[in-house]
């Protein structure tokens, strides 16, 4: 499941790419209306994708009366991103070793077994298998 966006990104509003725009003729002595009045364009807020909403939902399932600080949420988000990157990198290497261009659930499962220690790997594999089975049955 991809991370959910924390903020909305402003749309580009139908602007053509820089190379495709029609040539505009300007007179040397004139400025545009915005430049003449000294107004600057406001930049839209950049979109930040996090796992915060998903972490919060899991927290409420496990401990409905417990909250979480922004700093703790940030740490957990970094943790999830780190584990995701490690698993994806290892799965990519496994696919390359086997001369495959697609990462399947098998590569993910093997990379989880290689990265996580002992009992934690077993639980992760069983939860992952359960999630894939649930997804496969609902997709039909």
From Swiss-Prot:
The keyword Isomerase does not apply. The modification N6-acetyllysine is found at residues 8-9, 15, 25. There is a cross-link at residue 134 (Glycyl lysine isopeptide (Lys-Gly) (interchain with G-Cter in ubiquitin)). InterPro entries: Histone-fold, Histone_H2A/H2B/H3, Histone_H2B, HISTONE_H2B_site. It is found in: Nucleus; Chromosome. Keywords: Acetylation, Chromosome, DNA-binding, Isopeptide bond, Nucleosome core, Nucleus, Ubl conjugation. The keyword Nucleus applies. Residues 1-10 have a biased composition (Basic and acidic residues). CDD domains: HFD_H2B. GO terms for molecular function: DNA binding; protein heterodimerization activity; structural constituent of chromatin. There is a cross-link at residues 8-9, 25-26 (Glycyl lysine isopeptide (Lys-Gly) (interchain with G-Cter in SUMO)). Gene3D superfamilies: Histone, subunit A. Monoubiquitinated by the ubc2-bre1 complex to form H2BK123ub1. H2BK123ub1 gives a specific tag for epigenetic transcriptional activation and is also prerequisite for H3K4me and H3K79me formation. H2BK123ub1 also modulates the formation of double-strand breaks during meiosis and is a prerequisite for DNA-damage checkpoint activation. Acetylated by gcn5 to form H2BK11ac and H2BK16ac. H2BK16ac can also be formed by esa1. Acetylation of N-terminal lysines and particularly formation of H2BK11acK16ac has a positive effect on transcription. It comes from the Eukaryota. Residues 1-48 are annotated as: Disordered. Residues 11-21 have a biased composition (Low complexity). One of its GO terms (cellular component) is nucleus. It holds the Pfam family Histone. Core component of nucleosome. Nucleosomes wrap and compact DNA into chromatin, limiting DNA accessibility to the cellular machineries which require DNA as a template. Histones thereby play a central role in transcription regulation, DNA repair, DNA replication and chromosomal stability. DNA accessibility is regulated via a complex set of post-translational modifications of histones, also called histone code, and nucleosome remodeling. Belongs to the histone H2B family. This is Histone H2B. It comes from Aspergillus clavatus (strain ATCC 1007 / CBS 513.65 / DSM 816 / NCTC 3887 / NRRL 1 / QM 1276 / 107). The gene is htb1.
């Amino acid at each position: 499941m991809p991370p959910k966006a924390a903020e909305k990104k402003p749309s580009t509003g139908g602007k053509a790419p820089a190379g495709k725009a029609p040539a505009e003729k300007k007179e040397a002595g004139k400025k545009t209306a915005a430049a003449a009045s000294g107004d600057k364009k406001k930049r839209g807020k950049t979109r930040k994708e996090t796992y915060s909403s998903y972490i919060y939902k899991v927290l409420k399932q496990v401990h409905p009366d417990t909250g979480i600080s922004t700093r703790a949420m940030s740490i957990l988000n970094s943790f999830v991103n780190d584990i995701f990157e490690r698993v994806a990198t290892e799965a990519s290497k496994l696919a390359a070793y086997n001369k495959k261009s697609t990462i399947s659930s098998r590569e993910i499962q093997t990379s989880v077994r290689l990265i996580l220690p002992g009992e934690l790997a077993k639980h992760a594999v069983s939860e992952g298998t359960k999630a894939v089975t649930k997804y496969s049955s609902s997709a039909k």
